[in-house]
From Swiss-Prot:
Reactions catalysed: S-ubiquitinyl-[E2 ubiquitin-conjugating enzyme]-L-cysteine + [acceptor protein]-L-lysine = [E2 ubiquitin-conjugating enzyme]-L-cysteine + N(6)-ubiquitinyl-[acceptor protein]-L-lysine
Gene: Rnf180
Membrane-topology annotation of the record: Single-pass membrane protein
TM region positions: 565-585
Residues modified to Phosphoserine: S231
Record-given protein name: E3 ubiquitin-protein ligase RNF180
Organism: Mus musculus
Length: 592
C-alpha cells in the first residue's frame, strides 16, 4: 500500500510519535510506544526500500510484548498466549495475529510473535504530547478538489473528551437566523458547550452561515484516505443533512479556488461548482419564508444518496438526487462514519414530515427527515404484521366456532392474505401425515381417530386389510369413516392439487385395493339399546379440525356373534347356570 511522503516528519524520532488506525472504522488502535521499532523509522525504511523486492520488504508492524495495548493483552489472555487473530475491538475487522507456539520469522529478520498488518492499518503522524489528540490542521472544503491539504484552516487544541464535537449554529436576531436555528439538526440528545474552540467557517454576511461540524479529535490524516475507508475519521456516529433551502443555491460561475489559511472566509461571492461529488453554499440576496414553505412542500418523495469523490482528509460530499427535484433543491450530505450507515443506504422506504411539523420542531433526530429501514427492521415489521394477522385469525376462529367446517374454513381463509407464504401451518391442516400431500377422500380411522387420505389407507391395507395398524399410533384399525366436509374444504382451497391427486389415483391400481377393516359380526336379537352420549369434540393431533364423532363411537349396542366366544361359554359354568334359569322360566310361564 502506497504511503504518503508526509508520513515522515522533519523532527527527530525521539520527538515524534504516531498512531495506527483501523482501515475500516478509522479508530485508533495502537501508538508507536507499543512497537519494537518506532513507527516513523519503519515508515522511513519502507519509503527508502520501495524499489526493493517484495520478499525483502517488511509488511508487518512488530509489537513489543511488554508494552501491548490493553485490548491485545485481553485477547492474549483469552487465548492463553497460544495462537490467535487480532481483530479491531470497535468494528471486528481483521488487523493481524499472534503466535507463541511456533513463532514465525518475518522477512526483515524479526520475530512476528505479535504483529499488525500494514495493509490493514493506517499510519498517522502527530506531534509529541498529542498521541490521541492531534490538532485539526488540514480540513479542506468538500467543494475544493485539490490544493487544500496544505492550507491551515483551523488551529486549536483538543478537547477533554474523546467523542466531543461541536456543531456551528447560525446565531442571529433576524428572521433567517431564528429559522436557521430552529431547523438545525441535532445528532446528540444534549447540547455541548463551546470551550476554546473556533468556528470552522465564518461568513462575512450574517445571513449566511452554513452548518459545518467541528471535531475535537482532529484526527485528519495528512495523506490520501484509505482505499476502503468511506468517510472522515471523526468520532461522530450520525449523519448531518444540510438543507440548501435555507441558502438559495445559485448558479453563478464565480470560482473560489483556495481557502484562506487563518482569516475568516468570505462566502459572499463563493459559488463552487455543483456536480455529482459536491455542492456549494452561496449567500442569498433575500429570504422569503413563503418560498421556503413552497420548497418544503414540493420535496421529493424518494431520494437516493450518491457517494461523491473523496478529498484529502476523507471528507465526502454527496448529492441526493430525485426525479422531482431540480438542482436548486439538492441537499448537502456530509457522510460521517456511523454504525447506522445502512439506515440511509439499504432501504427504499422514506418518511417525510409535514410543513408545520418541520417548522415547529426546534430539534429532531435525523431519522424523522430521511428515515429508511434496513433489512432487519423490515423483517421485524413483517413478523409483527404476521403476528397481528394470526391473532385476528384466532379471534375469528373463536367467534365462528359454532358454524360448520366449510364455512369456518372459508372465514379463516378470508383472514389470511398470503395462504402459503404467510401461514404455512394452515396448509398443514389439510395435509396427510403419510404422503405429506393434501387430503383426497380423507377417512377417519377408528378407534384412534386419525385421518388419512384414501390412497394411503388402501396402500397400507393391501396385504392385510383385517389387521392394518395405524401408521401413527400402531393401533389396529377396525373401521374407517369418510370425512365429507374435510374433503369438500380441501377441494375448495386446493383445487389444483386435489385434481392432480385424483387423476393419479384413478389411473393407478390402488383404487381397487380394499380399505382397512376388521371382521364384522352380526347383531344377535337386536341388542340392548342404551342412552346416547352427549355430543363431544376432539382435537386431532395432525390437523386443526374439530369434528363431531358421535356416530363414530363404538357401536356395541348389540351382541357380536363370535364362534370363539360360543365355545368358551359352552364350557363355562355360566352357560349351565343360564340354561337352568331358562328352563325354570319356561316351566313357570308355560305350564304343561
Amino acid at each position: 500500500m502506497k504511503r504518503s511522503e508526509e508520513s515522515t516528519s522533519t523532527q527527530s524520532p525521539e520527538e515524534q510519535t504516531g498512531t495506527l488506525h483501523c482501515w475500516r472504522c478509522r479508530k485508533c488502535i495502537a501508538s508507536s510506544g507499543c512497537f519494537m521499532t518506532p513507527l516513523e523509522t519503519q515508515v522511513v525504511e519502507q519509503d527508502r526500500h520501495e524499489s526493493v523486492d517484495a520478499q525483502n520488504t517488511c509488511h508487518l508492524w512488530h509489537m513489543n510484548v511488554d508494552a501491548l495495548p490493553e485490548w491485545i493483552s485481553c485477547l492474549l489472555q483469552k487465548a492463553q498466549w497460544t495462537v490467535g487473530k487480532l481483530n479491531c475491538p470497535f468494528c471486528g475487522a481483521r488487523l493481524g495475529g499472534f503466535n507463541f507456539v511456533s513463532t514465525p520469522k518475518c522477512s526483515c529478520g524479526q520475530l512476528a510473535a505479535v504483529h499488525l498488518c500494514k495493509s490493514r492499518t493506517d499510519h498517522q503522524a502527530a506531534q509529541g504530547g498529542r498521541l490521541m489528540r492531534p490538532a485539526l490542521k488540514h480540513l479542506p472544503h468538500p467543494g475544493v478538489p485539490s490544493g487544500c491539504d496544505k492550507e491551515t484552516l483551523l488551529t486549536g487544541g483538543g478537547s477533554k473528551t474523546r467523542n466531543h464535537w461541536l456543531l456551528s449554529m447560525a446565531r442571529n436576531s433576524n428572521g433567517l437566523g431564528r429559522l436557521t436555528e430552529a431547523l438545525c439538526l441535532e445528532v446528540r440528545a444534549t447540547y455541548f458547550e463551546m470551550k476554546n474552540e473556533k468556528l470552522l467557517f465564518k461568513a462575512s454576511d450574517p445571513k449566511c452561515q452554513p452548518f459545518v461540524p467541528q471535531p475535537d479529535t482532529g484526527r485528519c490524516p495528512s495523506r490520501a484516505s484509505h482505499r476502503k475507508s468511506h468517510s472522515l475519521d471523526l468520532n461522530i456516529s450520525e449523519k448531518l443533512i444540510l438543507l440548501p433551502t435555507l441558502y438559495e443555491i445559485h448558479r453563478k460561475p464565480t470560482a473560489y479556488p483556495r481557502l484562506n489559511e487563518t482569516g475568516p472566509i468570505d462566502l459572499s461571492g463563493l459559488a463552487l461548482p455543483c456536480s455529482n461529488s459536491s455542492c456549494s453554499f452561496q449567500s442569498p440576496p433575500s429570504f422569503d419564508p413563503n418560498m421556503l414553505l413552497h420548497r418544503l412542500s414540493v420535496a421529493p418523495h424518494e431520494t437516493q444518496a450518491q457517494r461523491g469523490r473523496e478529498c484529502q482528509c476523507g471528507l465526502e460530499a454527496s448529492s441526493v438526487y430525485s426525479d422531482h427535484a431540480n438542482a436548486n433543491s439538492l441537499p448537502f450530505l456530509m457522510d460521517l462514519p456511523s454504525a447506522g450507515r445502512s439506515v440511509l443506504e439499504a432501504s427504499d422506504q422514506e418518511e417525510h414530515l409535514s410543513q408545520l411539523d418541520f417548522l415547529r420542531s426546534a430539534s429532531f433526530p435525523l431519522g424523522t427527515i430521511n428515515h429508511r429501514l434496513n433489512n432487519r427492521e423490515r423483517s421485524k415489521l413483517r413478523t409483527l404484521r404476521r403476528q397481528q394477522r394470526r391473532e385476528r385469525w384466532l379471534q375469528k376462529q373463536g367467534k365462528y366456532s359454532g358454524v360448520g367446517l366449510l364455512d369456518h374454513m372459508t372465514v379463516s381463509n378470508e383472514m389470511s392474505t398470503d395462504e402459503e407464504t404467510e401461514f404455512p401451518e394452515e396448509k398443514d391442516s389439510y395435509m396427510c401425515a403419510v404422503c405429506l400431500d393434501v387430503y383426497f377422500n380423507p377417512y377417519m380411522c377408528y378407534p384412534c381417530h386419525h385421518i388419512f387420505c384414501e390412497p394411503c389407507l388402501r396402500t397400507l391395507a393391501k396385504d392385510n386389510p383385517a389387521s392394518t395398524p395405524c401408521p401413527l399410533c400402531r393401533t389396529i384399525i377396525s373401521r374407517v369413516f369418510l370425512q365429507t366436509e374435510l374433503n369438500n374444504a380441501t377441494k375448495t382451497f386446493f383445487t389444483k392439487e386435489y385434481l392432480k391427486i385424483k387423476q393419479s389415483f384413478q389411473k393407478s391400481s390402488s383404487a381397487k385395493w380394499p380399505l382397512p377393516s376388521c371382521r364384522k359380526g352380526f347383531h344377535l336379537f337386536g341388542g340392548f339399546h342404551r342412552r346416547a352420549a352427549p355430543v363431544t369434540r376432539r382435537q386431532f393431533p395432525h390437523g386443526a379440525h374439530r369434528m363431531d364423532y358421535l356416530h363414530f363411537e363404538d357401536d356395541s349396542r348389540g351382541w357380536w356373534f363370535d364362534m370363539d366366544m360360543v365355545i368358551i361359554y359352552i364350557y363355562s359354568v355360566n352357560w349351565v347356570i343360564g340354561f337352568v334359569v331358562f328352563c325354570f322360566l319356561c316351566y313357570f310361564f308355560f305350564p304343561f
